[in-house]
């Protein structure tokens, strides 16, 4: 979709931000944007779109809220410490506060150009459950749909003569 931010573009922006980040508690890690059931390498981040809500604001304008989850699974061979997971969670609060989402728009010459839009995270939180870090963040996007063209009024001829006059 041209010029539109979607759950997939947000997921890709999160993955890009994580891949370019340096975590003090981690040496290396894998990134997965899809649900992987088996054969994945640890330590790893998994990125999911949890919930998408849409709220109408005005005529053709609305707000989309993308609730995203980033899970960090540490290496099972390493002794996992609560402090290490807290350190990663705290760094995620900084790294994912603003992501940069690339979208395609139509330029003034009619050609498609790639534009990067900053999107701020809200209601960020993390918790540690069974040695897995679960990080939740909401990204809110304002959007507009093209207005439907309403045909111009046509003239209507009115016959004002009563039935008896005919």
Question: Can you say where each PLM-predicted feature lies in the sequence?
Answer:
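Charged, amphipathic alpha-helical segments and their flanking helix caps
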Residues: 1-30, 53-166
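A short, hydrophobic beta-strand-centered structural micro-motif
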Residues: 42-50
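Short acidic low-complexity segments
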Residues: 31-42
